[in-house]
From Swiss-Prot:
Keywords: Cytoplasm, Methyltransferase, rRNA processing, S-adenosyl-L-methionine, Transferase. It comes from the Bacteria. It is found in: Cytoplasm. This is Ribosomal RNA large subunit methyltransferase E. S-adenosyl-L-methionine binds at residues 64, 66, 84, 100, 125. SUPFAM superfamilies: S-adenosyl-L-methionine-dependent methyltransferases (SSF53335). One of its GO terms (cellular component) is cytoplasm. The active site is at residue 165. The gene is rlmE.
Amino acid sequence: MAQKPKRTKSGSAWMHEHVTDAYVKKAQQDGFRSRAAYKLLEIDSRDHLLHPGMTVVDLGAAPGSWCQVAVQKMKRQGRVLAIDLLPVAPLPGVEALQGDFTAPDTLAWLENTLQAARVDLVLSDMAPNMSGVMLRDQARHYELCELALDFAVNWLKPDGAFLVKVFQGSGFEDFRNAMRRAFDQVVIRKPDASRDRSSEVYLLGRRPVKLESVAATGAS
């Protein structure tokens, strides 16, 4: 008889926390794909990021709860482009690609889909596959953040905004300073739906200070 795999204490604790989490239960009741929806809902209620008619790019979109919030808040009047290494099941009003944001063909898809149209809001909830080596994982995470920031600066409208998930610790201050150089206003948000024990916070940048030339990417 095959032996059942042992469940670690940390795995059991995570599972218990997950199934008893009020936001997990609420997401199931409200039809959202994950509890992360409430992070964006709370930030939007404070900062008024989403409006009908916008073009939104969601990086690290799977399973799609932020896309759901965006479509809902925009009343299906606008565009939502979603990218993730994992598949995003079809959602009305969302154009999704399963791909690696760091790969040239993924960026080419974005550029071709946008067709030189500027973006109102870039969302990034990206995180690397964790190796368990903290410094390495943090470095890889901020590499993704920097790529998302570069995309945002190049494609946002002058009054656009960039919301990115970051983790406080190594690399945080350097990235926040990069955000401050790129945007007129940068604030930190820690929504209630973020677990207290997590170092996760969100940086919100508004109004790019200087839109870099994007002639090479095909935008005008």
